[in-house]
Amino acid sequence: MENGAESILNCNSIKLANLPDFSEVEKLHKATAPSSAAYELIHGHCVVISTISWQIAHHCNMLLSSENHAPQMSDTLRKRAELAKNCLQELVGDSYAILPAISGGLAPKQYIDEYAALIGGLLHDIGTYFVLESDGSSNAGGILRFDGPNYILHGLRGYKYLIDNGFSEDAAQFARNHTGVGLTREQVVVQNLPLPAEDYIPQTVEQEIVMVADKYNSKSIPPRFLTVDAYRRKAARFGEDNANKWMQLVAKYGEPDIAGLAEIFNMRVDA
């Protein structure tokens, strides 16, 4: 597997990702969730991340299209973008019309697959259904709680679950490659994490966007949003290089309006 951001520049604007239908992903969440409480928390988080991922991808595409001598988006990508818009409207309903704008960011070198960003956001945390210490069911007394020591396994468990259920490698990598700001083999070894010693780093722009979007929302109970600064402080616990990488990603993709999103999704904000 290629390592580093350099490989991301040659992404699936050329070869589009093989991804499932929106309805298939929605059915997967319902079939996988062990309880309504688990579904509401995990699927709800994925809806938020899918929304932010789409916003980032769409925003970056608008930045590229506004440049002088910008290339036209291909017909295939344009159709995927329209599909993504329709799916997002189904996900968030009337809130689509009042989604707050993203500020800043850089125009990408190539157009981004907005459908891949949206579907990747919906898929990325499917593995968290398999790291529940208490699953929120009646047998668990309605208590919902994650298994903290094994939570780091959710990406790999989600990846394997998707592959085992016939989903493509393209789809499964959204689950595998979204932890932190990119989890390297070295970090796995140094931190003695219970994972195979490999890189868990985004391999496409769309995977990187989902990884970034994921940092703005937490599946705490109750769930909450995090500002850029709140996640920077969290990233800094693993070293200043980690925090700097986060700020570079924010500069690259822009900053969502977290207060506005929190109001739409009725969640609190950690500033």
Model-derived segments and spans:
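Acidic/His-rich, divalent-metal-binding segments that scaffold phosphate/diphosphate chemistry
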Residues: 2-150
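Charged phosphate-binding loop/patch that engages nucleotide di/tri-phosphates or the phosphate backbone
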Residues: 239-271
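C-terminal/domain-terminus segments
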Residues: 68, 228-245
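Divalent metal-dependent catalytic cores for phosphoryl transfer on phosphate-bearing substrates
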Residues: 106-232
